Amino acid sequence: RAGSWIARPICDVNDATSGFFAFRKKLIQSLPEGARGYKIMLELIMAGQGKLNVTEVPIRFNNRQHGTSKLSFSHQWTYLQRLIALAGGTVTVNTASRFALVGFFGVLIDVLIFQLMMRHGAGLGFAHMLGFIVAATFNYSLNSKWAFRQHYDGTLRWRLFSRFLTVSIFALLLRGGILALLVYAWHVPPLLAIFPAIIATATINYFGSAFYVFPDEKHSLSPDIRWRVAAIGVVIFILSLRLVYFGLAQLIPDETYYWQYAQHMDLSFYDHPPMVAWLIWLGTSILGHNEFGVRIGAILCGFIAMSYLYAFAQNLYDKSTAMRAVLIFSILPLGFASGTLMTPDAPLVAAWAATLYYMERALLADRHTAWLGMSIAFGIGILSKYTLGLLGITALLFVILDPTARRWMKRPHPYLAATLALILFSPVIIWNIQNEWASFAFQSTRLLDDGYNFAVHNLIIYMTIMLTPIGLIAAGYALLSSNSPEDDTFVRRRRLFVQVFTGLPLFIFFVLSTFDLPKFHWTGPIWLAIIPTIAWMMTQANHLSPMAKRLKTAWQPTIIICTFAYALILHYLVLGIPGAPYPHSLTKHYYWRETAAEVERIAKSVRNKTGKEPIIVGMSKWSIASALSFYTHESTNLDIRSRNLMGDSGAMYDYWLPSQLSTDRPIIQISMKHTHLDKNRHGDDIRHLLIRPGIIEHRVIERYDVPIRSVYYRVSKGLEEILNF
């Protein structure tokens, strides 16, 4: 069974290792000369390049009762080698042993340089990067001239060198995360942590060299197989990045605010439904109140979204398209961010993908049982974010437009599904009833709070960010494609499904952007419906227009650039990049652990001078107060409030910590801008609310002895009654 499972990614049969099969005799001529092993059926299927019609007839055998299996280790190793060769790799005993020998000397060089740099006071990031660069240069020279000599003539080729450089950079950036995980999270000494980091890097380098740098070019592979192999490699790397870095990178203010949700558990909240709070509460209960505990829910939601997207794409098209769909989703910003950051978008995207899957099963495949799954997914989705309600409107439009799906309007299933989804949504309804419909009122009026703004151009920019330019062009091409006379009924219904479930939500966002500024991430989930079609177009370009062919060519650099960008950003956030400064546009909203430590020192100084416990007031709606609360909750018990203490709005802080009349406890205002210490967001002076306000001071926040930002603060003796304001 294990043999058949590992063969499934590159072929479309369930049991590629079966010894019972029948085929036309002339197909035996298609077998390659280098075919080895005993699984002839696998060789035939791969030689067919996806052009064979294969029918499987299940046969159940009893487990062996007598004797022993003829499979020896040599048989299994031969099978694995052949499987890798069929996938385009050059993994052999010869190349592996030579690569290992070269790698051994590379490890010695790497470790020596790393230890030398660390002993001379270099930072962890600089030491590991310098050691890797020197060792990788040495390894490339010997690998190209010796380890892979039978597949490569040893001369310098810039194309191969650029590929080697790409693989090496990816390995380097992931290695930094592994090293940081071992040192910062698991407290392994750096001189020991470098060894497992090197082993992980060597694994990436070897398989990257075998499949990408020095692939087997003697036997041509179909584009379909090449994309499958690329999908497997890239998705594994993306998942590795998430798993390594998700607990190392500091939380963004939004995540700390939702962590505050979990500290004040309720049926719902003012600005979002409760799902994000429930997931954070569960994660922190298991892993603790740290980045790991907060973000584990996002990681799981990312896996769920990938799984449902794969199944959805396979139902619409085929297995190869499904693998490419997961690849595209993984490298697009909408997929990477939602699977890494613990915001309401994480469960929303997972629920959106699940709802699409069940809606396709119900409306296109006519599966009665899919309505139950749809109701649960839809209910969970609107418990994550109200945006998922758009799928309900979209489903109604599709049922109206599609004659076959219209039959469901006469059946009880849709109405029972809607009832169950409403029951799941009931906690939000109950909370709103108890709080004068505050959340519904906020969501329905927030668009025009800042006045009229024509922002269609902003929406287009945000869509470009979420999809990348190539992804946006491909989505537009897929969305505007029309039916062909040769299309059968299923193809027409499939196209209608994709266009309706993408087009209607997109149209609604375009309408909203004509009079108000949208958030950059609002359109993210709506592209899930069209990603399978984009993935299908990647291998159908020969039958499409010249534009589609150019899009096909552009996907490879897009995948590389996006993957590199994520790895570089994560390494930069955790370990930094030698010589790269910290831009103010980033640091003014990030690195709150260092800022919180400085605020603790300020509070300690005020406490020692006054003998009273100060009140920390973050002069923003919720971001400063939430970030400081998260990064001080273990070390100190500071009394941290939001700007609502000064009479301004504070979102959920209005419910958790409402403003008080007056106090003689010291007030420490904290802000990233000094103007926010004097005036509120409307421009009104707030200094008369303070008792004997001091001068505005600032502290420079450093990270690895590098200045990253300034924090402004003012200490006052107390607070007057807000009613006088």
Label every PLM stretch briefly.
Residues I296-L316, A354, Y358:
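Transmembrane-helix motifs of polytopic, lipid-linked glycan transferases
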Residues Y308, L586-F725:
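Luminal/periplasmic acceptor-recognition loop/helix of membrane-associated glycosyltransferases
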Residues Q314-S320, T355-W371, A478:
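Membrane-interface transmembrane helices that cradle and orient dolichyl/undecaprenyl
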Residues L334, T340-L348:
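Short acidic/glycine- and proline-prone juxtamembrane loop motifs at membrane-interface regions
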Residues Q540-G576:
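Signature aromatic-anchored transmembrane alpha helix within multi-pass, membrane-resident enzymes
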